[in-house]
């Protein structure tokens, strides 16, 4: 297979962690895993090795998560963080439907495409001013006020301001655009329905402050994976025996959990993923 810029023979495994990078599940992608999930079809390799790797990752994700939540029914997280390899419509539908996540922080792998509604959208799925595609509209509110109660995201004219009326002590929207795209005094309003395009609106506005702050947490996951490779010596193995590698991988996970327990007991939480400083 093709991994990180070179061809190699390798055994693949999947790790599920929490937001702290603490391992919660390890799945070895061996024959037993494929036998337990016959819906996973190993297709012929394409002309793009990188694409093959992404397809393999995306196909393994849902079976791993389904198995995990079946084993741990009391664990019910609402936020999913993953890389761009998981940017597929099928995965979004499963995450929000069958599995029950409310937000999915997954970078786009392919540019968004939307139907023509008289306005354009930017790379984050935010509608732009019909007269100026470089001017994104402003998000307003996070809950639906429509009678249908269908979840919506409301965007308003970026040149709209709330003004206070001293006479009747009320606030109203006033559009201060020199070239308005609507006759409404409060400016253009656009409602989008996330369920119609989960890639564009995965429970959170792409590019927002919430998106940027939350996705930073994924750094913990990358650090955890590096600790498995380096501190727990999973990388650069000499043996090619599958059972030995599988056992060593599980022991590495156990070692990390022991590290977490010890760090917690001695109140050194900064070392929950750092074995070497903890024993130094």
Positions of predicted regions on the chain:
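Short amphipathic alpha-helical "interface-anchor" segments enriched in bulky aromatics
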Residues: 84, 118-154, 194-240
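Polybasic low-complexity intrinsically disordered regions
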Residues: 1-84, 88-97
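Active-site proximal loops enriched in glycine and acidic residues that flank catalytic Cys/His/Asp
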Residues: 84, 108-109
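Long, low-complexity, polar/charged, intrinsically disordered or flexibly structured peripheral segments
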Residues: 153-207
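Short, well-ordered secondary-structure micro-motifs
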Residues: 92-93, 116-118
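Short hydrophobic/aromatic-enriched beta-strand-loop microsegments
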Residues: 99-108
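Basic, amphipathic alpha-helical segments enriched in Lys/Arg and hydrophobic/aromatic residues
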Residues: 213-280
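Short gly/pro/ser/thr-enriched loop/turn and capping motifs at secondary-structure boundaries
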Residues: 110-115
């Amino acid at each position: 297979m093709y991994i990180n810029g070179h061809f190699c023979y390798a055994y693949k495994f999947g790790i599920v962690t929490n937001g702290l990078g603490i391992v919660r599940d390890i799945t070895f992608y061996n024959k037993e895993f494929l036998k337990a999930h016959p819906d996973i079809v190993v297709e012929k390799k394409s002309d793009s090795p990188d694409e093959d790797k992404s397809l393999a990752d995306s196909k393994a994700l849902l079976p791993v998560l389904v198995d995990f939540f079946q084993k741990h029914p009391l664990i019910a997280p609402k936020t999913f963080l993953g890389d761009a390899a998981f940017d597929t419509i099928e995965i979004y539908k499963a995450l929000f439907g069958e599995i029950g996540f409310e937000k999915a922080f997954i970078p786009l792998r392919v540019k968004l495409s939307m139907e023509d509604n008289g306005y354009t959208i930017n790379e984050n799925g935010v509608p732009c001013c019909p007269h100026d595609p470089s001017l994104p509209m402003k998000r307003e509110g996070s809950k639906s006020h429509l009678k249908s109660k269908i979840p919506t995201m409301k965007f308003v004219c970026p040149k709209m301001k709330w003004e206070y009326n001293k006479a009747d002590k009320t606030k109203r929207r006033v559009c201060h655009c020199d070239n308005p795209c609507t006759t409404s005094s409060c400016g253009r309003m656009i409602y989008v329905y996330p369920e119609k395009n989960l890639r564009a609106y995965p429970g959170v506005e792409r590019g927002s402050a919430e998106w940027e702050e939350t996705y930073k947490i994924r750094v913990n996951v990358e650090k955890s994976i590096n600790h498995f490779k380096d501190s727990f010596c999973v990388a650069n193995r000499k043996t090619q025996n599958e059972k030995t590698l599988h056992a060593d991988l599980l022991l590495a996970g156990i070692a990390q959990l022991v590290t977490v327990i010890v760090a917690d007991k001695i109140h050194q939480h900064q070392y929950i993923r750092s074995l070497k400083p903890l024993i130094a």
